């Protein structure tokens, strides 16, 4: 299934916002208005030296016993979930973005209003995510793959959808990325509605390309 988010911030702004120390020279990417699953995206994690590094990863978390990739992981109970607990303990990462999109559910056959959600003052913001290495059986190459965490919606999102991206607040970046013996589930908070803004950006015909960011849990 598909999801959508926007990243207008360039590499330099992302590096400054997230205090990235490594990977800048080796990583190249362009801003864009509409990114979807299966695409390669810049992701921030700690490298073996404990530095914040930016690397390109595929938005398609791969599990050995599932043929289809997963794009999202539920925040609730992730520290105990069979598919996610190891990645949340050892592979926490942050995905920079500037807006997320959601299509409001309507009666069958009617057009779906598309809404944009932003966090004023956080351009870019950080989406909580997890990553892992996956060996592509076709190429025999190892690929970095990731999934975005989601949780209960706040009052702004609830009328549009029953799931919402889990955001990492700036004061929590260091703790979220740092290696720990116990997973920092206390950081997976619902962002208060007053910190976000939403606006209607389009009313489009229903299409297979307009599937929620939050449906592939």
List the model feature ranges, each with a label.
Residues 1-217:
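Short linear sequence motif anchored by a di-proline
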